[in-house]
């Protein structure tokens, strides 16, 4: 039996340096955001993120790390290099540049000694409103310890910019997209395939985009008994009511970052299961302010705190590979 430590983190605008190659359109969109974003500041930002990741999982770091708000593969490789040097592990990357307006992507980093990924079964689904925005990344993993297969789905849904209700239809579209691919995965691989969904959904577990459109529920029993529609069990309901959250806005915590699992992780004979009680929001004094909210790193153009990390807390869980 082996345990796999899985972490998700919104890295808060991990842009490449100000003078890195970009399309003219992206330069126009990011012009103010990149002012003063030097190689030195980027290196400091990466070091801060890696320092926090070094603290999790008994100082061993994650076995698989899902991230969002990463600009491109170049900056992702810089991040990986620092992570590998700090943890003495070798990670591989799953990433593709998407058409997001701000050029920020979803990616996975995974320990190559523990996992293999089927490159023929890696998919990048773009969520489109009036223009392409955000993405969903799907990858088939195989545990090198047990040879068991599972699917990870990373999400970064459209933001609440312009108002929560006004922007909600875009997240409903994202929820429909996730539900479709959850159905498709199970049609192809069978209901027994373990699926772990993670991401920054920019909505909470009880919002309609999650419950009605992504088909994610507080009831494991509903997931197990579902016949025609494959539901997802949302692990973040465990934190509802605890005044905990992953993102702080307008004097309140929000649970925007979430884990969800398919029926294949809930049945008694599941190939992989989430260790009971292992889901956690990772909070260390070094990544939070005195009042307990995330200490963001920011940008020179709008307030820089080089002792900060991100405006989101990471979340983690343990997968039991029996």
Predicted segments — roles?
Residues 1-90, 94-99, 104, 290-293, ...:
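N-terminal, active-site-proximal structural segment of metallo-dependent hydrolase catalytic domains
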Residues 9-11, 37, 42-45, 49-77, ...:
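Active-site beta-strand/loop signature of hydrolases that rely on acidic residues for catalysis
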Residues 22, 29, 152-170:
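Active-site His/acidic residue clusters
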Residues 50, 130-141, 175-183:
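A Trp-anchored, charged/polar loop motif used as the substrate-binding/catalytic surface
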Residues 66-149, 155-158:
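Structured beta-strand-rich core segments of catalytic domains in phosphoester-bond hydrolases
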Residues 74-75, 102, 161-163, 204-208, ...:
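Extracytoplasmic/secreted cell-surface and envelope-processing proteins
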Residues 119-121, 162-167, 208-210:
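A short secondary-structure junction signal
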Residues 140, 184-196, 202-322:
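Metal-dependent phosphoester-hydrolase catalytic domains
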């Amino acid at each position: 039996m082996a345990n796999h430590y899985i972490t998700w983190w919104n890295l808060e605008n991990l842009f490449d340096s100000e003078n890195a190659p970009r399309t003219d359109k992206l330069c126009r969109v990011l012009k103010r955001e990149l002012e003063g974003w030097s190689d030195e500041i980027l290196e400091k930002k990466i070091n801060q993120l890696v320092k926090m990741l070094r603290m999790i999982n008994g100082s061993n770091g994650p076995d698989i790390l899902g991230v969002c708000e990463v600009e491109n593969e170049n900056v992702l490789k810089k991040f990986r290099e620092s992570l590998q040097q700090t943890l003495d592990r070798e990670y591989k990357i799953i990433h593709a540049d998407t058409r997001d307006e701000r050029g920020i992507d979803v990616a996975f980093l995974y320990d190559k000694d523990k996992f293999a990924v089927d490159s023929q079964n890696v998919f990048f689904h773009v969520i489109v409103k009036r223009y392409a925005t955000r993405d969903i990344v799907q990858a088939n993993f195989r545990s090198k310890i047990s040879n068991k297969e599972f699917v990870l789905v990373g999400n970064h849904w459209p933001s609440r910019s312009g108002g929560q209700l006004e922007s909600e239809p875009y997240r409903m579209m994202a929820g429909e997209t996730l539900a479709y691919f959850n159905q498709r995965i199970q049609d192809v691989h069978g209901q027994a395939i373990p699926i772990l969904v993670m991401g920054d959904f920019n909505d909470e577990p009880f919002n309609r985009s999650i419950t009605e459109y992504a088909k994610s529920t507080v009831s494991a029993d509903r997931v197990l008994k579902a016949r025609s529609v494959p539901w997802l069990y949302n692990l973040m309901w465990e934190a509802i009511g605890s005044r905990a959250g992953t993102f702080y806005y307008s004097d309140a915590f929000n649970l925007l970052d979430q884990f969800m699992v398919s029926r294949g992780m809930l049945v008694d004979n599941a190939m992989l299961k989430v260790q009971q009680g292992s889901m956690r929001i990772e909070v260390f004094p070094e990544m939070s302010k005195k009042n307990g909210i995330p200490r963001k790193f920011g940008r020179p153009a709008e307030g820089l705190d080089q002792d900060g990390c991100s405006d989101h807390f990471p979340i983690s869980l343990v997968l039991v590979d029996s």
